Every structure is written in C-alpha cells, then in structure tokens.
C-alpha cells in the first residue's frame, strides 16, 4: 500500500522520510506520507541483485521464481527507478553490482534478465529501442 505522490510531494516528504517510495511513472511515485507509515512497513521491500519478485504493470509484484517460506521478499531497484541516485549494495548475491544507480535499467544485461518484470513505464522505454 501507499499513496500516489507527485514529484513535488515526493520531494517534500522525502526530506523527512528519506527514500521510501517506488516510482510508478515518469512523474508519479507511491509511498508512505508519514514516518509512522514508513516505520509500520508500508512500501518496505529491500533491493537484491538476485531478486525473487518482479513487477507487472505499475504496482503489482509477482514471484519470478519459487520463494521458500520465511525467505525475504526482494526486488531489483532497476525495475522501478529512473532517478539520479546511487546506493551501495550489500545484498551478498554472487552477481551483486556493488553500486546501484537510478539508471541501471539502461544496462543491456539487466534489460535481458528482467524483460517483462520492469515497471510498465520503464518496460515501454526499453521496448521502444528494440
């Protein structure tokens, strides 16, 4: 769950909460609006370079493989992010990229790996270059 936020709303809320949203279009995001919502787990999914979840459409997460009971649910931020940002990755996977950026979706190897699992607005951009 979460609230649909404009870029301006996301920027204002982000000053207090830090990054806690998922980008769903070029200019819209979904996320919590208060610290209590964020701390309560709203929109809390961690990144992994070997995720078990992908996206269908804008906000529906689906399993990309079988997930065992108790396994953490993760997705690759490359599936949703198109913002100028950087984050050190410590996911521990064999394919860890070490540095995650808001432009990782441009990498051909990730486009191939996650084809059909990107947020629709990113998938549309990728498909237009094929």
Language model features by range: what are they?
Residues 1-53:
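Catalytic cores of histone-lysine modification enzymes
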Residues 47-130:
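C-terminal SET catalytic tail plus cysteine-rich post-SET Zn-binding segment of SAM-dependent SET-domain
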């Amino acid at each position: 769950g979460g609230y649909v936020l404009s870029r301006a709303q996301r920027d204002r809320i982000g000053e207090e909460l830090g990054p806690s949203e998922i980008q769903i279009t070029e200019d819209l995001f979904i996320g919590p609006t208060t610290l209590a919502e964020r701390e309560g787990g709203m929109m809390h999914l961690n990144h992994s370079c070997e995720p078990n979840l992908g996206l269908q459409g804008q906000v529906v997460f689906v399993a990309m493989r079988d997930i065992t009971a108790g396994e953490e649910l993760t997705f690759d931020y490359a599936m949703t992010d198109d913002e100028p940002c950087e984050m050190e990755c410590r996911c521990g996977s064999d394919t860890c990229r070490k540095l995650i950026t808001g432009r990782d979706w441009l990498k051909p190897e990730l486009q191939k790996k996650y084809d059909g699992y990107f947020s629709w607005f990113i998938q549309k951009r990728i498909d237009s270059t094929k």
